[in-house]
Amino acid sequence: MSGSTILCIDDEALGLEIRKAVLERSGYRVLTAVDGATGLSLFRRNTIDGVVLDYYMPEMDGGAVAEAMRRERPEIPIMLLSAYINLPSEVVALVDVTLLKGEGPQELLEKLRSMIGKTDGQAGSDGHAPGGSA
């Protein structure tokens, strides 16, 4: 999936820059945003192949961003990053995969490759189509 465009959204600039460097070294084109509103703007204006999204951000958290993205372009896969192990089930249902912050670059790359390699309409990591009703 090299050459794919990934949108990374995280209010922590250092983590964002590290993920950007890891992804670019692996051949991805990376767009970054430090807040949900900017991320949604980039999402709307660009062709995006996948999203790597932080859960805990001020003003607009990752759940609200994922919900807006699903309404507009439900086919775009979303990975949710969090330092929290227990995320609300309604948020987890909106995304294709979750990744615990602090996991290494290899885990990020493996989950991203798997996520963007899925074809439209395939089930998410929990066996349900992302954004579907439970």
Report residues per predicted region.
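Active-site residues of response regulator receiver
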Residues: 54
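Output/docking surface of receiver
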Residues: 94-116
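Acidic, metal-coordinating helix/loop segments flanking the phosphotransfer/catalytic sites
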Residues: 32-50
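Conserved phosphotransfer cores of two-component systems
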Residues: 44-46, 68-75, 93
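Receiver (REC) domain active-site loop signature in two-component systems and cognate sites
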Residues: 57
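Conserved acidic segment of CheY-like receiver
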Residues: 3-14, 19-23, 51
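Acidic catalytic/metal-coordinating carboxylates
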Residues: 35-38, 61-65
